A protein has these predicted regions:
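Flanking scaffold residues of small Cys/His-coordinated metal-binding clusters
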Residues: 73-77, 101-111
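Ferredoxin-type iron-sulfur electron-transfer modules and their immediate structural context
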Residues: 1-95, 114-133
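Short linker/helix segments within small regulatory modules
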Residues: 93-103
């Protein structure tokens, strides 16, 4: 007998709302008691990707998505929902933002492979088998 599960009529990435429907949230700075800075939290995670190839790649057929769809239509949600700040945009050239993937920060939550507009990231199990499959 198969385990029971919820059945959904669409993939989760289809529920990501466009930027026109939302206002930015101004989060308070970490207090060092209940909330901590990113580097402290990454050290506590115990993940280590030193000298490993990236396990996060943009799907070949979706190379245009980060800069054209995610950034322009959705205000780059990957820069906010990723708890390890793996995704950021290099804004040196204002007219051509470039997605930078800091895979060494990844804590293997797989949110990016589930929630990103157009599901443009291919998430593979890192060397050593860390993270969900």
């Amino acid at each position: 007998m198969e385990p029971w599960t919820f059945h959904h009529s669409h993939v989760d990435s289809e529920t990501t709302g466009k930027k026109v429907a939302y206002q930015p949230i101004d989060y308070p700075k970490p207090d060092g008691v209940l909330s901590f800075d990113l580097l402290s939290n990454l050290a506590r995670s115990g993940t280590n990707h030193a000298d490993q190839p990236s396990h996060l790649r943009i799907k070949e057929e979706k190379k245009h998505v980060p800069e054209t769809i995610s950034m322009q239509e959705y205000a780059a949600p990957e820069t906010r929902f990723c708890p390890a700040r793996v995704y950021e945009y290099n804004m040196e050239n204002e007219n051509e933002p470039e997605l930078v993937i800091n895979s060494q920060n990844c804590v293997h939550c797989k949110c990016c492979s589930i929630k990103m507009p157009e599901e443009y990231i291919k998430w593979t199990v890192p060397e050593g088998g860390g993270g969900p499959a």
